[in-house]
Amino acid sequence: MYKLVLIRHGESTWNKENRFTGWVDVDLTEQGNNEAQQAGVLLKESGYTFDIAYTSVLKRAIRTLWHVQDKMDLMYLPVVHSWRLNERHYGALSGLNKAETAAKFGDEQVLVWRRSYDTPPPALEPTDDRAPYNDPRYAKVPREQLPLTECLKDTVARVLPLWNESIAPAIKSGRKVVIAAHGNSIRALVKYLDNISDDDIVGLNIPNGVPLVYELDEDLKPIKHYYLGDQEAIAKAQAAVAKQGKAG
């Protein structure tokens, strides 16, 4: 049996302000830093250790991983940074307040943009300052692979090559893997691992800073999964994530 640990970054400044963040590189809040540190303490106290880590190229996930490594005394851990683990790109919604957007377009439309599987928000213009084309962290990524908006289906399509080519082989070789990423890149992995339907994935919410453990068989099929920590607090955090896109 193999174990895989997934962690969504701690609360970011734009999580706190209820904004669509996507590929915008915002940092953690004080609470977010604390959540990440607590995740590291919890993992260490629960007897976990790791051989390799994966994260995105966005600082809120990178810093979350740093805190986990620090609290586990694993600062030497090899780390793979990949744009493929970035948050889903929210296109022209990037930076907008979720409740204000819901008041303008309606709760139902915003829920479709946030949570449907295959409906992306309106795209950025290629000349928009928020477009990834001139960002040095994507200099080696072919332009045609860089999104101007994404739905979850698009996010799954870009995450899976990293899973198939790097993460899954690492797990099968016996390496203990931790992934510090984002709500939607983790939803993409969970959808794939648990074979969740396009309709049911709409209801899946990933809380900030809580380790999600997958126990996998020899074919990397899930045996079971569970969050580490206070289960009542985790359920409240998931409900709060679900509520973010509503006008009220």
From Swiss-Prot:
Q: Gene3D superfamilies recorded for this chain?
A: Phosphoglycerate mutase-like
Q: Which residues form the signal peptide?
A: none
List the pathway annotation.
Carbohydrate degradation; glycolysis; pyruvate from D-glyceraldehyde 3-phosphate: step 3/5
* Top EC class of this enzyme: isomerase
Write out the GO biological process terms: gluconeogenesis; glycolytic process
Site (Transition state stabilizer) residue list:
H182
Under the heading PROSITE patterns, the entry gives:
PG_MUTASE (PS00175)
Name the active site residues.
Answer: H9, E87
Instruction: Return the PANTHER family for the record.
Output: PHOSPHOGLYCERATE MUTASE
Quaternary structure (record): Homodimer.
Q: What is this protein called?
A: 2,3-bisphosphoglycerate-dependent phosphoglycerate mutase
**What organism does the UniProt record list as the source?**
Paraburkholderia phytofirmans (strain DSM 17436 / LMG 22146 / PsJN)
Source gene?
gpmA
